[in-house]
């Protein structure tokens, strides 16, 4: 059974790894006390092909499971799949908080001028897309403008660009006010 190692009082204790112009945060989020699997939130900023000079990066995040010997168990790109492992709703909230904190660490370290992100799984339900909006809020809070831009073959695309000042948008206001879904 999954045991979350993140507590409400914990600050994100993770180092930003940097190499080949990529920035990575790998945060331990828990373990399975029956089979020994360890679970990490893996968050990466990688330069878009041909755009390194412009400081435009792609952001991706997932949950990765591995055995202590290093053998790979699985990678979960969205909540519809990770829910089978991380069952407790409170644990899921803590993990999402760790992902957002890791995104903030990467933005602070890389200082990208532009960021692009897309859903990994096509046709995600509204509840799953709201998590991307939560990650989007990290960008907005750090001085980026943007949000969801288009829908392509079931994938939602997001684009952000650094602006001179932090947005005055209320945290409760939808990022795309003209979108009836609010996301």
Predicted feature locations:
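Non-catalytic substrate-recognition and accessory regions of acyl/acetyltransferase enzymes
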Residues: 1-183
């Amino acid at each position: 059974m999954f045991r979350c190692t993140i507590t409400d009082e914990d600050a994100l204790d993770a180092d930003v790894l940097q190499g080949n112009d990529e920035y990575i945060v790998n945060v331990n989020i828990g373990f399975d006390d029956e089979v020994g699997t360890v679970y990490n939130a893996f968050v990466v900023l990688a330069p878009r092909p041909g755009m390194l000079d412009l400081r435009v990066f792609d952001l991706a995040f997932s949950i990765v499971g591995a055995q202590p010997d290093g053998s790979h168990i699985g990678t979960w790109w969205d909540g519809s799949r990770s829910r089978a492992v991380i069952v407790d709703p409170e644990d899921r909230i803590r993990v999402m908080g760790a992902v957002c904190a890791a995104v903030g660490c990467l933005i602070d370290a890389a200082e990208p001028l532009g960021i692009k992100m897309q859903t990994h799984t096509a046709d995600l339900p509204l509840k799953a897309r709201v998590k991307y909006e939560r990650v989007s809020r990290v960008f907005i809070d750090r001085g980026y403008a943007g949000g969801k831009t288009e829908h392509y073959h079931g994938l939602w695309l997001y684009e952000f660009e650094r602006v001179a000042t932090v947005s005055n948008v209320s945290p409760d206001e939808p990022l795309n006010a003209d979108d009836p879904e609010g996301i």
